Amino acid sequence: MNFETVIGLEVHVELKTNSKIFSSAPAHFGAEPNTNTTVVDLGMPGVLPVLNKRAVEFGMKAAMAINCEIAEHTKFDRKNYFYPDNPKAYQISQFDKPIGEHGWIEIEVGGKKKKIGITRLHLEEDAGKNTHTSHGYSLVDINRQGTPLIEIVSEPDIRSAEEAYAYLEKLKSIIQYTGVSDVKMEEGSMRCDANISIRPIGQEEFGVKTELKNLNSFNNVRKGIEYEEKRQAEVLKSGGIIEQETRRFEEATGKTSLMRIKEGSDDYRYFPEPDLVDLFIDDAWKERIRAEIPELPDKRQIRYINDLGLPAYDAMVLTLTKEMSDFFEATLVAGADAKQASNWLMGEVSAYLNAEQKELHETGLTPENLAGMIKLIEAGTISSKIAKKVFRELAQNGGDAEQVVKDKGLVQISDEGALRTIISEILDNNEQSIVDFKNGKDRAVGFLVGQVMKATKGQANPPMVNKLLLEEMNKR
């Protein structure tokens, strides 16, 4: 029997506000444990929450960016559960009236585009953080408690691990462009749970789902889904049944293990938050927030293709992160050719960032010095090979491209007389290569070009070397 996989993703994103959603405590990552707290976060008796307007507006902006309808009337609810990192014994969330509903984003997998529906986007507060030690006790940090979150719930439209990965990449890119979050999974500002079920191909009814947690990277989301697909298929083929449960992805083994039997909404005993009034959002407020949304990656990608003549793949890669896209645009403003700037950013720059595990702003590169280097290549001052040395110097230490070339003595040798002298000397020492060339062995030319480049430490003008080398060999 063959099965179809059905996946829905729940993505939590921390909003980049200065203070928490219901208290005045700072909402910054990395502080000493239990220092970013107030009596509201600690759940002290008699304290009252105060709604952070900026968190609401960030939620509206994110919802609009993923094509959600914004509610005219929304409210907050209490989700009741007891856990050490939740001092109040309830979480303030949104149950039946979320701030955004009925959205969608478009993904592309294997050259095919597909719309993934968004069921809802709602606001809520984050919980604290438990650290379980090997000594039989746990440490609780309340700093994260009350940090504003949006939860984005997809429709069960995803059919493979690859589609789930593409959905997360696209969602991260869109949220990043809006500026409401830095969406860094390594810092916990973007987290994902996956709901997975399988059903016989052709069956309309959904199978019993399991929820996967501890998915701390996009790759782990993919691996967890792939494992769970196989596990559920093996259970059904052996005559077993799938239990509705929550499972943990174990990164070390690549497998999932039981955490607990999955709760339903009734288990949380939702009821309207009595300490917060309902929220009404009028058209004027919506339009003001909509006007703040910048050009999003899909539109920017189309502009790069139509206006700059970039290939679709280049446009997609350049717009994947806002930092890379903004850097590219600033490089064009600084005078660089669009295709050359694209090639450098997608090639050497991306390779350097991956190898060094850095982001653009953590290097010495600027749009101005990258554009300056590209202009030096176009002017023939340096070759593409020399440019790689210049690039590394700029990436590591910053500075001006032209000054680096002067200081390092990297100006390309384009003097015909100097090159002819070097070529003549190399031909005198490699007479067999001349014979091979005249016998039709083209590899001999490549060897001799390499000898010239070696003699000039890579600074000879390559097209001129080829031209002069052929001229000198034909004279002999």
UniProtKB/Swiss-Prot annotation:
Q: How is the subunit organization of this protein annotated in UniProt?
A: Heterotrimer of A, B and C subunits.
Q: Does the keyword Ligase apply?
A: yes
Q: Which GO terms describe its molecular function?
A: asparaginyl-tRNA synthase (glutamine-hydrolyzing) activity; ATP binding; glutaminyl-tRNA synthase (glutamine-hydrolyzing) activity
**Biological role:** Allows the formation of correctly charged Asn-tRNA(Asn) or Gln-tRNA(Gln) through the transamidation of misacylated Asp-tRNA(Asn) or Glu-tRNA(Gln) in organisms which lack either or both of asparaginyl-tRNA or glutaminyl-tRNA synthetases. The reaction takes place in the presence of glutamine and ATP through an activated phospho-Asp-tRNA(Asn) or phospho-Glu-tRNA(Gln).
- Reactions listed under catalytic activity: L-glutamyl-tRNA(Gln) + L-glutamine + ATP + H2O = L-glutaminyl-tRNA(Gln) + L-glutamate + ADP + phosphate + H(+); L-aspartyl-tRNA(Asn) + L-glutamine + ATP + H2O = L-asparaginyl-tRNA(Asn) + L-glutamate + ADP + phosphate + 2 H(+)
Q: What is the similarity comment for this entry?
A: Belongs to the GatB/GatE family. GatB subfamily.
* Organism taxonomic ancestry: Bacteria, Bacillati, Bacillota, Bacilli, Bacillales
EC primary class: ligase
Name the UniProt key words of this record, in alphabetical order: ATP-binding, Ligase, Nucleotide-binding, Protein biosynthesis
Name the record gives this protein = Aspartyl/glutamyl-tRNA(Asn/Gln) amidotransferase subunit B
- Keyword hit for Ligase: yes
Record's Pfam families? GatB_N, GatB_Yqey
Question: What organism does the record attribute this protein to?
Answer: Listeria monocytogenes serovar 1/2a (strain ATCC BAA-679 / EGD-e)
The biological process GO terms on file are: glutaminyl-tRNAGln biosynthesis via transamidation; translation
InterPro entries tied to this protein: Asn/Gln-tRNA_amidoTrfase_suB/E, Asn/Gln-tRNA_Trfase_suB/E_cat, Asn/Gln_amidotransferase, Asn/Gln_tRNA_amidoTrase-B-like, GatB, GatB_C_1, GatB_Yqey_C_2, Gln-tRNA_amidoTrfase_suB_CS
Give the Enzyme Commission number: 6.3.5.-
